[in-house]
Each structure stands twice: as C-alpha cells, then as structure tokens.
C-alpha cells in the first residue's frame, strides 16, 4: 500500500514511524514532511494547495492518505482527495467545522443539549463589549476560527 501523510509535525512524524514498520506499506510519502522523516519520501508543496496535493497523490499512485493538520482539513483537502478517488483518513471539510469554528461548535453543543460553558457571539467590537459586560467573571474570549491551540484572551 502506498501511503501519503500530510503535514510536518510531531504527530505526522509518529504516524510515519509506525507505518514504516508495517509490512503492508510498500511506499511512504510525506507532504511537505521534514528532515527528521527519513522513513518517508518528502514531497515538496503546500498542504493548503488542494489541487497540488491531489496531483502529487495521483502521480505517486497513492492508495491512502492521512490528513491530520487542522488547516488542510478545514480547507477541504480530504474532500478534494476523495473526489479524485484517493481514500483518506481525516474528516471532511464539513466535519472539520467542529474544530475550525468555535461558533459552529458552541451552537452545535447548544442545539443538541451537550453541556458547555455559556457563550455569546459578537460580530463587532461594540457587540463584544456589551456581551462581556453582561457576563459574570471569569470570562474567556476567543475568536472564531483556527488558532492552533492559542487565541484565548
């Protein structure tokens, strides 16, 4: 099986290390990868460029692609690869919304009665200030969108 792992971080490094020991894996690629991923052939390119990743996957005859970084998931990379016939591990763009959008996640929890801290959505600074003044402290302020584990005020 020919496998492509998207990303260049520690998580992807661990996945490549594990896959390298599996005798069913006949070729292992990373895009973009890094110098520490000696077990994989690192392909050049931006994992946010869906067309490029699909092209690389088709050229290398990839059987299975693992997509774990948040940005390519939110950008719809799994959708693009699957549309081209490449099987993937990773959520679709729609499913990745739960991580990519704090507003989506909080509204989903509210809709289905999943316990979560109270929240307000503000679309301007003034709306945000009004919401803050109406809430008891402590308060967490977070922008909608991906923040790589950061972004809390």
Question: Positions of the model-derived regions?
Answer:
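ATP-binding N-terminal substructure of ATP-dependent carboxylate-amine bond-forming enzymes
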Residues: 1-93
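Short, charged, surface-exposed secondary-structure boundary motifs
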Residues: 38-41, 97-103
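A short alpha-helix-loop-beta-strand transition element characteristic
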Residues: 88-91, 113-118, 137-139
């Amino acid at each position: 099986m020919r496998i492509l792992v998207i990303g260049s971080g520690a998580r992807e490094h661990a996945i490549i290390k594990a896959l390298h020991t599996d005798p069913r894996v006949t070729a292992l690629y990373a895009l973009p990868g890094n110098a520490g991923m000696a077990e994989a052939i690192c392909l050049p390119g931006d994992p946010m460029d869906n067309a490029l990743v699909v092209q690389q996957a088709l050229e290398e005859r990839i059987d299975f692609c693992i997509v774990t970084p948040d940005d390519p998931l939110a950008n719809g990379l799994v959708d693009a690869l699957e549309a081209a016939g490449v099987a993937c591990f990773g959520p679709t763009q729609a499913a990745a919304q739960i991580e990519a959008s704090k507003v989506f996640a909080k509204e989903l929890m509210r809709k289905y009665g999943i316990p979560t801290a109270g929240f307000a959505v503000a679309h301007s600074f003034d709306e945000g200030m009004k919401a803050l003044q109406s809430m008891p402290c402590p308060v967490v302020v977070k922008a909608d969108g991906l923040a790589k584990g950061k972004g809390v005020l």
